[in-house]
Amino acid sequence: LENAGANVLIPRERDCQTAEIIIDNDGCLNTRSAYVENTADKAWMQGNGKGFAHLRSQYTDFENPFKEGTFRTIETIKKGKESIAEWIPEIPQNGQYAVYVSYQTVPNSSDDALYTVYHKGGISQFKVNQKMGGGTWIYLGTFGFDAGKNNTCKVTLSNRSAKAGQIVTADAVKIGGGMGNIARRISEEGATDNLKSSDKT
């Protein structure tokens, strides 16, 4: 379905890369990664509502990182100088990494938000329909990246569009699948069995 152009949301992590880098407009746990805005004819502004924030390495019941932060907005242009948001990661090791973007769907969202991924193999561009899919991770593709932090390894978002006057939103980028971030409790039954086993020894 993806090869045919469909947007497929998979609840299970698709990437076997154990490293994970999250870059967000509200800050990064990896302080060497960076979110940068470049303003031209239109200015980036704070969005109304809640966005993503990477506040902790693990999450428990009822904690939703997509409701704990903010996001940025900008009006699209058809002509003139574009404004760019950049997510610049520090890659821990050479390898293949899945790239995901997060944004918020708002009234008059753009249907062709232009993302560009700079990677080891060159440059790949994607037009994302932000009228849908806000508040989650949207998969762009898997790419090779070299270790370190440089301008040849980043994700950008432009406000250039086929339609002027729409809204593009910028929030977070995730690179790599990681090891999971849901803190799982030990079941009472399992804990009881372990105690019984230890009593017999």
Regions found by a protein language model. Give the residues of each.
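Extracellular carbohydrate-recognition regions
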Residues: 13-51, 181-201
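Short beta-strands within extracellular/lumenal beta-sheet-rich domains
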Residues: 69-91
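Extracellular carbohydrate recognition and processing domains
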Residues: 120-150
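A short beta-strand element within beta-rich, extracytoplasmic domains
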Residues: 83-107
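Short, surface-exposed beta-strand/strand-loop-strand elements in extracellular ectodomains
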Residues: 105-124
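Extracellular beta-strand elements of beta-rich domains used
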Residues: 140, 173-175
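Short beta-strand-plus-loop segments that form exposed binding edges in beta-rich domains
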Residues: 155-167
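Structural recognition of the beta-strand scaffold that forms the well-ordered cores
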Residues: 8-11
